[in-house]
Regions:
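Conserved G1/Walker A P-loop phosphate-binding module
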Residues: 1-88, 96
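Conserved, well-folded catalytic cores of nucleic-acid-processing
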Residues: 32, 51-55, 70, 85-92, ...
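Catalytic P-loop NTPase motifs of RecA-like helicase/translocase cores
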Residues: 44, 67-69, 101-102, 130-131, ...
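P-loop NTP-binding site
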Residues: 190-301
């Protein structure tokens, strides 16, 4: 087989304020649900590496927590993880929501981009939710504030213009061989992905302060002789009242969380799953360094 001398490989940070569709975009591009999705801000808490391998290029996406002004130690960790990613990559995707006006969150990020020498591509997402004539003024508003290397309007949900986005990204990647095996799509351990899928269901089914106060850990994950997978996971919250909400009347909420999470986990693992969920209280865990370290925050995972 003739070697492709023009093959490119590189790392691309995906940044933006919370809830602009970063994880939806990455999941769609790699064709697998790795980063969890929710309409709640600060859904992504850690840097997630997702790998797209094509004949001419391997693009390693780093899906980052939304950059925002932190209100607690967990928030400080999330922003540090997002901003630290910018130093390691070949290009940056700045994802914005076409349905919302440019606000303080975008200005906050643009200030931080001024310090980077990396090419920044403006990705205007949710194009399917606006009229076409509305796109140009939105783009002009952003390009008037920053000198972007490229601009690509897309719809991640409807898979509109994603090939154009990939072509734009490849312009800024260095030539070189693949960093990762062709069949590898993430560096995330299965346990971590499973924990995130459980947390995603909590985000979907609860509201108010609950989503931000939740952490999930997989305590046990074993394959049984019949190839079924047994998983025991603990959902941590900060208050007894939150624990009651997660469990629900006669355990109904916890059962619904488990049923929805189990379906996604079975798709991920390709095996029948027995999911055993527990709920525990760790008071004010988001502001306690020791607990944050136990949950894997504040260090590279």
């Amino acid at each position: 087989m003739e070697k492709n001398e023009q093959h490119k490989s590189g790392f691309v940070a995906v940044i933006g304020r919370p809830n602009v569709g970063k994880s939806t975009l990455v999941n769609t591009l790699i064709g697998q649900k790795i980063a969890i999705m929710s309409d709640k801000p600060q859904t992504t808490r850690t840097r997630i590496l997702c790998i797209l391998t094509q004949p001419d290029a391997q693009i390693v996406f780093l899906d980052t927590p939304g950059i925002h002004k932190p209100r607690h130690k967990l928030g400080e960790y999330m922003v540090k993880a997002a901003e630290g990613t910018l130093k390691e990559v070949d290009a940056i995707l700045f994802v914005v929501d076409a349905t919302e006006k440019m606000g303080p969150g975008e200005f906050y990020i643009l200030e931080r981009l001024q310090a980077t020498m990396k090419p920044v591509i403006l990705v205007v997402n949710k194009l399917d939710l606006i009229d076409k004539e509305q796109a140009l003024p939105i783009i002009s508003h952003y390009t008037g504030k920053y000198s972007f290397a490229g601009v690509v309007p897309i719809s991640a949900a409807e898979q509109v213009n994603l090939d154009s986005l990939l072509d734009e990204i490849k312009k800024y990647l260095p030539e070189g061989p693949q960093y990762y095996p062709e069949d590898m799509i993430t560096d995330q351990p299965e346990r971590l992905i499973v924990a995130e899928l459980v947390r995603e269901k909590v985000l979907h089914l609860t509201r108010d302060e609950i989503p931000h106060a939740v952490a999930v850990e997989v305590d046990e994950m074993t394959t049984r002789p019949n190839d079924d997978v047994y998983i025991r996971a603990t959902i941590y919250v900060e208050r007894d009242s939150q624990k009651g909400i997660i469990i629900g009347a006669k355990g109904t909420m916890l059962k619904e969380i488990g049923a929805l999470a189990r379906a996604d986990i079975q798709n991920l693992l390709g095996s029948k799953v027995f999911l055993d969920l527990w709920v525990k209280v760790r008071k004010d865990w988001r502001d306690r360094d020791g607990i944050l370290r136990n949950f894997g925050f504040g260090e590279e995972r």
